[in-house]
Design a protein with these regions (language model features):
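Active-site signature of alpha/beta-hydrolase-fold catalytic machinery across serine-
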Residues: 18, 79-83
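Conserved loop-alpha-helix segment in the C-terminal half of the alpha/beta-hydrolase fold
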Residues: 177-204, 208, 216-224
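Conserved HGGG/HGGXW glycine-rich cap/lid loop of the alpha/beta-hydrolase fold
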Residues: 2-40, 62-63
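Active-site nucleophile elbow and catalytic-triad environment of alpha/beta-hydrolase enzymes
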Residues: 142-161
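Active-site loop/oxyanion-hole signature of alpha/beta-hydrolase fold enzymes
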Residues: 32-66, 82, 106-110
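Flexible "cap/lid" loop of the alpha/beta hydrolase fold
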Residues: 82, 86-88, 92-126, 150-151, ...
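Gly/Ala-rich beta-loop-alpha elbow adjacent to hydrolase catalytic centers
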Residues: 68-73, 77
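Short beta-strand/loop motif that positions the catalytic acidic residue
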Residues: 164, 170-172
Length: 228
């Protein structure tokens, strides 16, 4: 199966290299999606540009792909399901959840000179970054790509109710499946409360398992995709 890999904030497509290699060895065709503004040098990219890049990958896939979104990019994966509900086999959210209609895509941190730079490690102390040593943290911060303001502040627009019929799996790294279910039951993740086929998978890692547990993440993704 084609497995589209959509990276979260501050990350380029190469963050998936080890996961992609493992997926290929398991018989799948991984496709890291090149997002405008995350590795191409552009600071003027918009949320719509990134959605268009994901949709282009969906349309180019052989058969129905599985779309994997990490962290904030869970919303990109979900926007793809909204735009192509009949063309996507499954959506997988890794370490995050989709934003609701009308919400900003990623208004988490302050913009500086039109971009949202990596804020340093203080906001991620605890389970998020517990499995990243000092060397890994330095490398991550040095490679982090400032997110264009037009992406970070873009407003999420969802319109097709058929998105709720697309199967969804949630990979739970720095939180547990039980916590995710509690948040959904509490109304904190309204989009997932309406998904008809929703499953949860535990992964013992921090927020960036593509860095710290790539083989394990690849196995979970392959299992979510089912027989190739």
């Amino acid at each position: 199966m084609d497995i589209l890999l959509v990276a979260g904030l501050w990350l380029g497509g190469s963050v998936w290299d080890d996961v992609a290699a493992a997926l290929r060895s398991l018989g799948h065709r991984p496709v890291p999606v090149a997002l405008p503004g995350q590795g191409d040098g552009s600071t003027s990219a918009t949320l719509e540009d990134q959605v268009a890049a994901v949709l282009a990958a969906v349309d180019a896939a052989s058969g129905k792909p599985m779309v994997v979104g990490h962290s904030a990019a869970c919303t990109l994966a979900w926007l793809a399901a909204d735009a192509r509900p009949d063309k996507i086999a499954k959506v997988v959210f890794v370490g995050g959840f989709p934003a609701a209609d009308g919400k900003p895509y990623a208004g988490f941190f302050e913009l500086r000179d039109g971009v949202m730079p990596f804020p340093g490690w203080d906001p991620f102390e605890g389970p998020d970054a517990a499995d990243l040593d000092e060397e890994a943290r330095r490398a991550f911060a040095a490679a982090a790509i400032p997110v264009p303001g037009g992406v970070a502040t873009g407003i999420v627009r969802l319109s097709d109710e058929r998105r709720f019929a697309v199967p969804v799996a949630v990979v739970c790294p720095e939180f547990t499946p039980a916590q995710a279910k509690e948040w959904i039951d509490a109304g904190d993740i309204p989009e997932l409360a309406r998904v008809g086929d929703l499953s949860f998978v535990d992964l013992d890692s921090g927020h960036w398992p593509m860095h710290t547990k790539p083989a394990e993440l690849a196995r979970l993704l392959a299992a979510a995709a089912g027989p190739n």
